[in-house]
């Protein structure tokens, strides 16, 4: 995954707030995955148009006290891609 990669939710997968779980979850045909606050903050920015660099920039602006989230965001998005929650493509 590169910073120029564009990430999007796979068909049938979506992020939503689940009151019963008191957290954000990824819903998908086979079930759901409960997310922590950090994962939800990252995935809220996944829209199929933004690249990884834009997501990182927005999170660095939103959470300046974190001291740079670049590596953590890339690592999480790679895991989300491996879990098949999101797709990753290079811009055309």
From Swiss-Prot:
GO terms for biological process: pyrroloquinoline quinone biosynthetic process. Pathway: Cofactor biosynthesis; pyrroloquinoline quinone biosynthesis. Keywords: PQQ biosynthesis. One of its GO terms (molecular function) is quinone binding. It comes from the Bacteria. The keyword Ribonucleoprotein does not apply. Functions as a PqqA binding protein and presents PqqA to PqqE, in the pyrroloquinoline quinone (PQQ) biosynthetic pathway. Monomer. Interacts with PqqE. Belongs to the PqqD family. NCBIfam families: PQQ_PqqD, PRK02079.1. This is PqqA binding protein. It comes from Klebsiella pneumoniae.
